[in-house]
């Protein structure tokens, strides 16, 4: 079986993206996994801090490892939206394949410092346990909800989108493997319709950073927006609310 990073590279070269789906129960896991197998595509299962606490950190690792080993199938486990080094460390120590460190509410330099700490720890653990571990970080405001909302949250707009310059600085300063930028996407779904995505910003950020990009807040977005952003450099798409 190829590595996590190799599957991401394959998706990039083919102009595709890997689906990342959050779960909070066994039924959802099996539904997502069975569809992935039917389509013969790799899959990423995500657990936020709250979902991880509900499902169980060790239980989630055991479930994913069992499916991957038993079926020899590319299914990976991601610690989605973790808000401290300590939270990331606990997930990686338990056996998660990757983690998203989300510190967008902190000043940029403090964000960089803690994100770099996560990257360095992941590298050390990867060598110690001889397994691949990826670190992703979010940059720019994307909102925080996983619900159906009446309107787009205040503060979300073009002015809060990630710039190529900030993305380049952040990636070079931290050494992250994956970046989740703000490109018009917002977590959650909206009764008024989701905002449009900006593939031109995706392209500019990808060219500036040279690393795979991740689209968060995919629930409710239009198919044509997905396709345009994937062609521009998105390699992973997150879906949660819509499930």
State the predicted function of each range:
Residues 3-14, 24-51, 58-76, 82-211, ...:
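Alpha/beta enzyme core
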Residues 216-219:
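Glycine-rich beta-strand-to-loop/alpha-helix junction loops that act as flexible
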Residues 241-243:
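A C-terminal functional module that forms or caps the active site or interfaces directly
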């Amino acid at each position: 079986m190829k590595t996590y990073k190799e599957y991401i590279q394959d998706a990039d070269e083919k102009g595709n993206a890997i689906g990342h789906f959050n779960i909070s129960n066994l039924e959802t896991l099996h539904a997502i996994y069975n569809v992935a197998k039917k389509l013969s595509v790799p899959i990423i299962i995500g657990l936020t801090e709250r979902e991880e606490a509900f499902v169980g950190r060790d239980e989630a690792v055991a479930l994913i490892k069992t499916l991957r080993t038993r079926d020899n199938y590319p299914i990976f486990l991601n610690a989605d939206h973790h808000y401290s080094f300590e939270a990331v460390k606990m997930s990686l120590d338990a056996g998660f394949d990757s983690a998203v460190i989300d510190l967008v509410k902190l000043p940029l330099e403090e964000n960089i410092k803690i994100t770099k700490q996560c990257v360095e720890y992941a590298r050390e653990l990867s060598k110690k346990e001889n397994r691949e571990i990826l670190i992703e970080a979010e940059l720019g405001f994307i909102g925080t909800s996983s619900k159906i909302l009446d309107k787009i949250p205040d503060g979300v707009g073009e002015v809060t989108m990630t710039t190529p310059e900030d993305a380049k600085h952040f990636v070079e300063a931290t050494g992250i493997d994956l970046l989740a930028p703000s490109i018009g996407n917002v977590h959650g779904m909206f009764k008024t319709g989701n905002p449009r995505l900006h593939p031109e910003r995706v392209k500019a950020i990808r060219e500036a950073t040279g690393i795979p990009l991740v689209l968060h807040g995919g629930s409710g977005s239009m198919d044509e927006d997905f396709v345009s952003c994937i062609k521009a450099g998105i390699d992973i798409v997150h879906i949660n609310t819509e499930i």
